[in-house]
């Protein structure tokens, strides 16, 4: 196997990998870890939690459908910084969640900037930066 590609492009591979794994904060598997605590703290049922999660996810998907194309229109660095800061903001905001409305907003933000934008952006950057070796890059992720 030819490892020269990985050594010469390590910097870019690290950036796309960090974005890809940073998306974990908005992924179902990560949020599900805290679902029991969220239900307990808010005194809500499984059904109510599922509805909140579904609403945040659907709103996020609708906005992602509308705004997903901006990943190809704006500078990658600026967009990456915006996504990371926004995702961190919604993670931090979870500390202050005191009502259902704020919880829905937080779930929306985590799903949009994590599951949606960070993972989409990492794949778009793979396509932009590695047009000839896109397959190798995606396999690396």
Please report, for each region that a protein language model flagged, where it lies by residue.
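Hydrophobic core of transmembrane alpha-helices in multi-pass small-molecule transporters
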Residues: 21, 90, 101-117
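Intracellular juxtamembrane helix-capping segments at the cytosolic ends
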Residues: 116-130
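Extracytoplasmic
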Residues: 11-50, 63-67
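Helix-loop junctions at membrane interfaces in 12-TM secondary transporters
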Residues: 10-11, 95-106
């Amino acid at each position: 196997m030819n490892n020269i590609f990985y050594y010469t492009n390590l910097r870019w591979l690290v950036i796309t990998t960090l974005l890809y794994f940073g998306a974990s904060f908005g992924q179902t598997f990560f949020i599900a870890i805290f679902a029991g605590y969220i239900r307990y703290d808010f005194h809500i049922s499984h059904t109510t939690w599922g509805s909140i999660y579904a609403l945040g996810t659907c709103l996020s998907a609708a906005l992602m459908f509308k705004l997903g194309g901006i990943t190809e229109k704006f500078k990658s660095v600026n967009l990456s910084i915006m996504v990371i800061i926004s995702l961190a903001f919604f993670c931090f905001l979870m500390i202050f969640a005191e009502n259902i409305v704020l919880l829905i907003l937080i779930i929306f933000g985590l799903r949009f900037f994590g599951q949606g934008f960070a993972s989409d952006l990492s794949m778009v950057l793979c396509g932009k930066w590695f047009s000839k070796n896109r397959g190798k890059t995606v396999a690396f992720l």
